Design a protein with these regions (language model features):
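N-terminal intrinsically disordered, low-complexity, charge/repeat-rich segments that act as generic
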Residues: 1-21
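Glycine-rich active-site loops that engage anionic ligands at enzyme catalytic sites
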Residues: 17-149
């Protein structure tokens, strides 16, 4: 089981990646960890924020139905999603539907935060008013249950 630590503005949570539902995309994400970026609120999507730098994940999207693995249309608090077309990762802290100015879009369901979301959601919601913050994604070593630095 691939587990990651997600850190935002001093709060860290643990998440499990969906290796069974999106094995190729999860594998590519795992390869590019640790990853750090400034994130901003996703104003059209509801309770969600997104990365501003493209993740270095190359996928042959033509091989997947809908151009992605594990396509999902709605997100609930704690969902981690990825849009291959623009290489953007997003995390829902509330009810959300990944949207662009052109409307709602299907995204790849990558994983889910397993820890208590309250403190993390509070920091994520503040992005609307405080502006960009640093997000860090790191692998968690399953043997030691420790987050490498």
């Amino acid at each position: 089981m691939k587990t990651i630590a997600i850190e935002l503005d001093g709060v860290s949570v643990r998440a499990v990646l969906y290796e069974d539902r999106a094995p190729i995309t999860v594998g590519k994400l795992w390869e590019c960890l640790p990853f750090e970026d400034r994130v901003t609120h996703a104003k059209w999507s509801g309770g969600m924020f997104h990365t501003n730098t493209e993740l270095p994940i190359d996928l042959d999207v033509a091989r997947f139905p809908f151009g992605m693995e594990n396509p999902v249309g709605f997100q609930t608090p704690g969902d981690i999603v990825y849009l291959p077309a623009i290489r953007e990762l997003a995390i829902a802290y509330g009810e959300a539907r990944f949207s662009w100015v052109t409307g709602a879009m299907l995204v790849t369901g990558l994983g889910r935060i397993e820890d208590d979301l309250a403190a993390f959601a509070g920091k994520a919601e503040r992005l609307q008013w405080d502006g960009a913050k640093t997000l860090v994604l790191r692998r968690i070593d399953a043997r030691t249950d420790a987050t490498p630095r």
